[in-house]
Design a protein with these regions (language model features):
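Short acidic, glycine/serine/threonine-rich loops at helix termini
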Residues: 1, 24-30, 58-64, 84-86, ...
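Short beta-strand elements
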Residues: 2, 67-76, 82-87, 126, ...
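Active-site phosphate-binding and catalytic loops of NTP-dependent enzymes
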Residues: 52, 212-219, 294, 298
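Glycine-rich loop/linker segments at domain edges
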Residues: 65-160, 312
Length: 377
């Protein structure tokens, strides 16, 4: 990219990498180097490029819009016999680095960053996953790799749908999931990264339910919601379960997150304090994405370009966060992203438990809660 922009051969380009905080997916795109390099070339001296907040927002590579449709079939005794999941979204790798995309069984390239999470560890009988590229998103907004990437929206759909399935079958949502986390067949896991398979996901789910007081009687308009995940990639799972406690104001539609309880099995924890910090940050990021963050694209530009209108989680909205790591001697796996993906569905499921309003869109705005309440009525 730089060689082409500067008209130089690649062997003349030297990149020096510095440890300067988190990029959270944005630094995987190298486009921001080009204007800095061109300015330096024009001035004949080193240049440090600093964007205004508005320019940074306009120049961003946001998380892709997505749409998902899921179906589930039940057999005798409420047993799940089939599940179908179709997801359409922008494919960030198709924009950033098309040559590295793997090929599917038919030899067609696909983007795992837009499909990870759909190939879950639940035993559901017949299973089909169909992932479609949203070409309009790819052409118009340059979709990026925002922290948690595909599982950030895939697991929102999967775990919200699991909750809906549990209620349709009239089964407790935790028990419903545990029934399918049986470690059968390909869900048994394998060495070195997924030893124990779905049984480890079941273990964190069981533990978080105990820790959060699942099944306790809640005050009016307060609910507990649960979600679980294996993190980013099936080939290197990080087992996470989250219970969210929320309070819903039926008049305003406002949702207040009161507590997040999270249990994680990430194999051997090498640096406990660093591990806890990663999970805290990931969980609060997930909460911000669940309840606050989002904008519209108007005439090809983001509508909200500064923090006066682009809403974020603020300190006053930070709930109690309780984290527990499962003692393990298994292979260490990633911790930067997995907890992000369990929070939003846990929040959505808690809203339903609190007031019966089922929300299916992120972020969860007060208006959407009021609409869901009205629809329920």
């Amino acid at each position: 990219m730089l060689a082409k922009a500067l008209g130089r051969s690649q062997d003349k380009i030297v990149l020096r990498t510095y440890l300067l905080g988190g990029g959270f997916g944005r630094r995987l795109e190298g486009d921001y180097m080009v204007p800095a390099a061109l300015a330096s070339k024009a001035l004949g001296k080193p240049v440090k490029m600093i964007c205004t907040r508005a320019d940074d927002m306009r120049f961003d590579c946001p998380r892709s819009p997505s749409r998902q449709v899921l179906r589930m079939a039940f057999g005798d005794g409420g047993r799940v016999t089939a599940m179908d999941h179709q997801a359409a979204a922008g494919w960030p790798t198709a924009v950033m680095a098309p040559p590295i995309m793997p090929k599917d069984a038919h030899g067609v390239p696909y983007d795992p960053f837009a499909s990870d999470g759909a190939d879950h560890w639940y035993t559901v009988g017949a299973q089909r996953v169909r992932v479609l590229r949203n070409d309009l998103a790819n052409r118009s907004i340059r979709p990026g790799l925002l922290r948690s990437v595909g599982p950030g929206w895939i697991n929102w759909a999967v775990e919200s749908f699991m909750d809906e399935g549990a209620h349709a079958a009239d089964v407790d949502p935790v028990a419903f999931r545990l029934r399918m986390l049986d470690g059968a067949g390909r869900n048994a896991g394998s060495a070195p990264n997924s030893v124990g398979g779905a049984h480890r996901q079941a273990a964190v789910l069981t533990r978080v339910a105990e820790k959060a007081g699942w099944g306790s009687v809640m005050p009016r308009d307060v609910g507990l919601g649960v979600a679980t995940t294996f993190g980013q990639a099936r080939s290197m799972p990080t087992w996470v379960a989250c219970v969210a406690r929320v309070r819903v104001d039926r008049i305003s539609g406002r949702v207040t997150a009161e507590k997040l309880t999270i249990v994680i099995d990430a194999g051997t924890i090498v640096h406990p304090d660093g591990a806890e910090a990663q999970v805290e940050g990931a969980a609060l990021w997930g909460l911000s994405l669940a309840l606050h963050e989002g904008t519209e694209i108007v005439n090809g530009q983001p509508k909200d370009t500064n923090l006066n209108t682009y809403t974020l989680l603020r300190m006053g909205g930070v709930p109690d966060v309780e984290i527990e790591f499962v003692p393990s001697t298994e292979t260490p796996v990633g911790l930067g992203e997995p907890a992000t993906t369990a929070v939003a569905p846990a929040i959505g499921n808690a809203i339903f438990a609190a007031c019966g309003a089922r929300v299916r869109h992120l972020p969860i705005r007060a208006e959407a809660v009021l609409q869901a309440l009205a629809h329920r009525a």
